[in-house]
Design a protein with these regions (language model features):
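Non-heme Fe(II)/2-oxoglutarate
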Residues: 1-93, 108-112
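Conserved double-stranded beta-helix
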Residues: 72-147, 152-155
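Conserved small/polar residues in nucleotide/adenosyl-binding loops
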Residues: 159-163
Length: 163
């Protein structure tokens, strides 16, 4: 398993996704995107096309349980979360994947700063970028190291002000 370690207070591991998992997720999304449940009501993104591939939480007015993913892809996600908790010496734990969705972002759409919550105190969340557009816009501030189209992880915001 190939991964990089980034220490930001909490551990962030960046995994290399096997090609068959990457291709499988893209194919499922492209083939079934019109029949996948809309996920907008349960997500904070300012994104028109947000659809769910997997949901195992309680049925509610926003989402019902479903699975459009084959066992091999789900097993791969479980192996990543097992590796993360083992590597960080967290355990023993009960792990369950609550949801997996796709955000198909277009120009001017974005995900605002937000948090993910779960039953495990580490708050495991994952992001996988399936496709990037060829053009991500003009890089105004750092032409030598463009950041457009990159995932930015914000660990903590601290506001200090006089009382």
């Amino acid at each position: 398993m190939k991964f990089d370690f980034v220490y930001l207070g909490q551990t962030v591991l960046k995994y290399q996704v096997p090609l068959e998992i990457f291709v499988g997720l893209n194919e499922i999304y492209e083939r079934k995107k019109k029949q996948l449940p809309k996920a907008n009501k349960q997500l904070v993104g300012k994104i028109q096309d947000e659809v769910s591939l997997f949901y195992s939480g309680p049925n509610n007015d926003k989402m019902h349980q479903h699975c459009f993913l084959p066992d091999d892809i789900l097993k791969w996600f479980h192996s990543i979360f097992d590796h993360y908790t083992d590597w960080n010496k967290i355990g023993p734990t009960q792990k369950s994947i609550n949801s997996i969705w796709v955000n198909e972002m277009k120009a001017h759409e974005y995900n605002p700063v937000h948090i993910h919550q779960g039953k495990l105190y580490t708050g495991l969340s994952s992001v996988m970028i399936l496709k990037l557009p060829k053009e991500t816009g003009v890089e105004y501030s750092a032409e030598e190291k463009p950041m457009n189209g990159r995932l930015q992880i914000i660990v903590c915001l601290l506001y200090t002000y006089p009382s």
